[in-house]
């Protein structure tokens, strides 16, 4: 009994060590998150994808806001990526409802490491957005690393 427990513990420790040593990889999709708080952080990180190219990993690509919880602040935070920055167009609405997004999500903050909108959304429309992160010092018009997401009022 003790021997099996020890072998199981050793196997679990070995798997944990392997998982910790693997480099960060870009995720194809992430789980949706429900945001019922006054502040909803979304972590953004530059990582290497399976081919070795730089890509964005975003903690949540679908943000579900409680329909009666307007006034929350959605904040994208650039983490662990000192060679990259947010710029004026780093979180941009796109798709069918892009034209009405500015009224539903007024801009709160733009900095090199944070980008935030206030949620005033009171309808059931889906708002698609694109996150863009730029290499620091790159000229205007440079190609950013891009990730897509959606914000929707949902239970």
Regions found by a protein language model. Give the residues of each.
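Short, surface-exposed alpha-helix to beta-strand junction/turn motifs within ectodomains of secreted
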Residues: 83-103
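Extracellular/periplasmic metallocenter environments
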Residues: 105-155
């Amino acid at each position: 009994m003790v021997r099996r427990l020890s072998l199981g513990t050793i196997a679990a420790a070995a798997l944990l060590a392997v998982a910790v040593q693997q480099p960060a990889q870009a995720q194809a999709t992430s789980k949706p998150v429900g945001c019922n708080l006054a502040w909803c952080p979304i972590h953004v990180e530059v990582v290497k994808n399976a081919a070795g190219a730089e890509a964005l990993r975003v903690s949540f690509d679908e943000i579900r806001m409680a329909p009666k919880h307007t006034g929350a602040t959605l904040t994208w935070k650039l983490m662990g990526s000192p060679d990259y920055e947010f710029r004026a167009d780093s979180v941009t609405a796109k798709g069918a409802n892009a034209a009405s997004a500015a009224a539903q999500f007024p801009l709160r903050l733009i900095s090199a490491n944070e980008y935030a909108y206030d949620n005033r959304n009171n309808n059931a429309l889906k708002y698609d957005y694109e996150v863009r992160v730029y290499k620091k010092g790159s000229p205007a018009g440079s190609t950013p690393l891009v990730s897509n997401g959606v914000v929707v009022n949902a239970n």
